[in-house]
A protein has these predicted regions:
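Extracytoplasmic/periplasmic, Sec-exported soluble proteins
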Residues: 35, 54, 58-66, 82, ...
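Sec/Tat-exported extracytoplasmic proteins
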Residues: 66, 70-81, 94, 129, ...
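Surface-exposed short loop/turn segments
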Residues: 23-24, 77, 87-138
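C-terminal/domain-edge helix-coil "capping" segments
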Residues: 21-36, 120-124, 131-180
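A structural "domain/chain start" motif
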Residues: 2-3, 7, 20-69, 76, ...
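Solvent-exposed loop/turn segments at secondary-structure junctions
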Residues: 48-50, 95-99, 134, 144-148
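Bacterial Sec-type N-terminal signal peptides, specifically the leucine/valine-rich hydrophobic h-region
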Residues: 14-17
Length: 180
């Protein structure tokens, strides 16, 4: 194989791995909540809080992707969308902030002549499930990770949103959404 071909394959592999950068997924259930009682949902009031990032604020493409991914995953878990008297209200929030990685700074005893800090975009998506009757938060799940180069590319963003939402909602408690 020619050196240029090897270099191209290596660069594409590195690019692909960047797209699959580590995403941290977390969730919690409100204590005392009987999560098995919830079967239907509807979208709660629109989130009016802005992120300060024009790539997300008032971005209908992004909003539609998040909402479609949430609905698809909830439906797969047995939830039904309700037009009247839902059990749950769904809300989400997304943010992007620039973070700095001081490459090698986390290993103070390792000599590194070529360690340089670099700035990257870190994204967070939070999905809240709220009891529609009491208006109390029942469950929250979120994903955090590098989205460098993703947020400015619609196809990549759609893929990462789908993956993040699926992984967030995988953490719903057993029995939530399914008929007993």
């Amino acid at each position: 194989m020619r050196p240029l071909a090897r270099l191209t394959i290596a660069a594409l592999g590195a690019l692909a791995m960047t797209g699959c950068a580590t995403t941290n997924i977390s969730s919690f259930v409100e204590r005392g909540s009987d999560v098995r009682q919830y079967r239907t949902y509807s979208w709660g009031p629109a989130n009016v809080q802005t992120t300060g990032d024009p790539r997300l604020d008032n971005n209908r493409f992004f909003q539609e992707r998040v909402e479609a991914a949430v609905e698809r995953n909830l439906h797969a878990r047995g939830f039904e969308k309700a037009t009247e008297a839902p059990d749950l209200l769904i809300r989400y929030y997304a943010s992007v902030e620039q973070q700095v990685n001081a490459n090698g700074a986390d290993r103070p005893y390792v000599a590194c002549e070529d360690c340089r800090p670099f700035v990257f975009d870190a994204g967070t998506i939070v999905v809240d499930l709220i009891d529609a009757r009491t208006r109390r938060l029942v469950w929250r799940g979120w994903a955090e990770g590098s989205i460098d180069g993703v947020i400015d590319n619609q196809a990549w963003m759609e893929k990462r949103v789908d993956e993040a939402v699926a992984r967030i909602l995988e953490r719903l408690p057993r029995g939530m959404g399914r008929a007993s």
